[in-house]
């Protein structure tokens, strides 16, 4: 669906290869921000964040990747993993952390700021998307759902990460006890475990609000019209 959405709307890239390299783009953005001001949200594989941690000094900043993250980032919100038990019945882990497991291990184990995980179980219970039928056909979110689900409701994994990043736990969720998300680099697919630890830098979301109530809040945000552009 991503290619179809990209083809339907104007943009400046003639080819995907014209897009800036992710780690370098992260470095330029982070270097321009005040210290301890940035919330990073990930809703996919963690190879780009691994590459950011592995990056070296450049024109954007004299700091190495881990140093730059530690200085500029306040927290990382990661849609990934499954908590507290990271394995499904087949022994595999959650999609975003299990494939590029080396990237997941490096990013999760070595990230130098607090991390909040919104796990598989959080978004799986929240079904959204039906309201997109009311939007104009030229709406990019509607078009993405049209090609991916036929405008049928689906789980809201990524939306929960975005909502927490902007509004916090609020009345939606509670935070787990501090701990460590431990990644296992198993062949062919990795998985995570949760280890409670009083000095741990990781937490995960725990459901609080009824799923149907939270689905209405998220869907209202999904179908809200964009703010008018100022000249």
Each PLM stretch: what is its role?
Residues 1-4, 157:
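Short intrinsically disordered, low-complexity coil segments enriched in acidic
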Residues 3-123:
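Active-site histidine-anchored catalytic micro-motif
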Residues 94-231:
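Conformational coupling and interaction surfaces
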């Amino acid at each position: 669906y991503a290619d179809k959405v990209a083809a339907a709307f104007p943009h400046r890239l003639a080819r995907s290869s014209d897009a800036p390299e992710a780690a370098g783009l992260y470095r330029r953005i982070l270097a321009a921000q005040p210290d301890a001001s940035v919330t990073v949200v990930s809703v996919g594989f963690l190879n780009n964040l691994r590459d950011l941690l592995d990056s070296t000094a450049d024109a954007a900043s004299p700091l190495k990747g881990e140093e730059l993250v530690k200085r500029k980032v306040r927290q990382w919100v990661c849609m990934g993993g499954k908590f507290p038990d990271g394995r499904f019945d087949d022994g595999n882990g959650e999609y975003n952390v299990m494939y590029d497991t080396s990237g997941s291990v490096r990013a999760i184990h070595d990230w130098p700021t607090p991390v909040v995980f919104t796990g598989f179980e959080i978004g799986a219970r929240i079904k959204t998307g039906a309201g997109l039928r009311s939007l104009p056909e030229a709406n990019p979110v509607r078009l993405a759902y049209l090609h991916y689900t036929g405008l049928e409701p689906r789980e809201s994994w990524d939306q929960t990460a975005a909502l927490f990043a902007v509004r916090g736990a609020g009345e939606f969720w509670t935070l787990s006890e501090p701990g460590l998300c431990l990644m296992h680099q198993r062949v062919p697919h990795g998985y995570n475990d949760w280890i409670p630890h009083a000095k741990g830098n990781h937490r995960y979301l725990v459901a609080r609000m009824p799923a149907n109530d939270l689905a209405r809040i998220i869907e209202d945000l999904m179908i809200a019209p964009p703010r008018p552009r100022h000249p």
